[in-house]
Amino acid sequence: MSSDNKYYKILLMENPFFNKRYDTPHEVPPFDKIKFEHYEPAMMEGMRLESEAIEALCNNPEEPTFENTIMPKTGEMLENVTSVFFNLLSACNSPEMEELSQKMAPLLSEHSNRITMNERLFLRIKYVWEKRHELDTEQQILMEKIYDGFLRTGANLPKEKKEELSELRTKLSQLSLQFSQNELHDTNAWTMHLTAEEDLAGLPESAVAAARQEAETRGMEGWVITLQAPSYGPFMQYSQRRDLREKVYRAMNSICTHDNENNNFENVRQLVNLRQQLAQIMGHKTYADFVLERRMAKDVEHVTDLMDKLLEAYLPVAEKEVAEIEQLAREKEGEDFMLQPWDFSHYGYLLKMQRYNIDSEMLRPYLQLEKVQDGVFGLATRLYGISFERATDIPVYHPDVVAYRVKDANGSFLAVLFADFHPRANKQSGAWMTTYREQWVEDKTGENVRPIVSIVMNFTKPTKERPALLTLGEVETFLHEFGHALHAIFSQVRYEALSCTNVYWDFVELPSQFMENYATEAEFLNTFARHYQTGDPMPQELIQRIRESRNFQCGYACCRQVSFCLLDMAYYTLSTPLAQDIRTFENQAWEKAMVLKTLDDSCMSVRFGHIMSGGYSAGYYSYKWAEVLDADAFSVFQQEGIFNTDTAARFRKEILSRGCSEHPMTLYKNFRGEEPGIDALLRRNGIGK
């Protein structure tokens, strides 16, 4: 045996990714055995094996069929290693992983391009597609998705155009990664070190304790404020130090604008222009045209129409809300007081207190993370009959992470769920749901392969003095990501490409935003909201004030979201290269939805990961689209009972379990009986009749 073969065998034995199946409960990735040095060899070998499998498939002398062309899983090893690597790149990062991601991104992109540009493979797929009438409904949908996917990656293009497209996609992959890492680094690079008690004026104890703990973690005295949401949000809302609010606000709004290696201005320009080039190679005038062709919204006109309707309804409300805050600020500070962006959150909080005598700190003692988790899991149990069992035998990727077995009402296994709740220095900000494995049915054995799901948050950590206590907004975030998780957990389709959240991009937020509706329902809060010290339930009059105040600043919030949609659409409806100054372009794009002035030197685009690197390019509207859907869907529960198990069973059957096995509008109408309208959203916000 040659030394090379010996090395390969040793590598195969030691590297968990080289095993076809993991020797772990439910074949969860063996996080406790995975080492950094395993990733690159496994990715390289995974690409080699997939290329071999594709070549064998193309060389098959038999007539192309669904079974011999569409069904074979050719990239299992590569999928296994990349799902772990890129998920941990967001949740449990390291400098070595970042460096490797930069190295592997172009190689993986080129590998993907070779597959989608493979003419022999495409001809086999096309042959099966032309006989799709012989397939059943779910097979036809899968066939359409695969065939369309090849078309949209350029399989039908002339050779020189394929090469150009391949280069574009590789550049986009590299730039997207660079954009994200620049934002992460620049966000983490800024801190404000406070050493005097007077600097803390107005801050609640929870914010003071978190700032103290942040300082201790860094080996510093005093308190440290960061640009992470659990630190930034409370400081801007509660701090009475206007000078410090301004400092923090300016820092947040200048992320990635500085003259350093994290500057993202040129990355924005290149990402927008490369996507425009890609769309035009594919025969579309703009990138938005290209994207929306395969969305529920269908085209730019439908998106624009929705935004116009929302602005018509909400802009007058938003302008009134801002005027009320300005009036309050002048009453407190004098007639000459000029409201600035760093004042809005603070005086908005004071107005809310004056009007409803409620703020997030009043609620926080009743929203202990463990109790909230019991409530959220309990909601799923009450609606769907499922249960969650903590599983200490399942490996996790960080000590903060907890694993659960999710079981159906009949006791059958549904999924593994990881819960990762707290910030870390090596973890991206924000909140998200992801999968390490999706659901499908093994064709040969009939085995129903169940998903491995993870919900990732950045909730304030517990301190020495008190447990982790959430704001109501964080409870909504929990429900949101848990809704995504249920979409994956309940998946019951035959093919992986149609399962879990592999649905139209403007449908994917329905299950998540639907769950947020429960956050202000008294019947839900009564199940878990207890004071962390006394055990007393949240008072009913406090719950009533929550419900009365839930539409506070809803006009401003809607217009702000619409402004982001307008910015997204402005970039991706360009038909010529973006040459304008980014700040100027941004201000012009969202001007008609802007009810609060922005700073001349601020810029959102350079840190707007959603539309630059996060998959929402020409798709940010989907959040508002999903709001229309979720309000309409929840109105059914309001009519029939918010815990009605028959309604929940119908929602699970027609929406949550079906993935992309039918067109989303068909699925929605199967549940609702009709297409959604905007009226339920307006009623929810106190604007409709």
Task: Report residues per predicted region.
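C-terminal, non-catalytic "cap/extension" segments appended to globular domains
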Residues: 10-38, 45, 222, 371, ...
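Intrinsically disordered or highly flexible coil/loop and linker segments, enriched in small
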Residues: 48, 52, 56-63, 80-94, ...
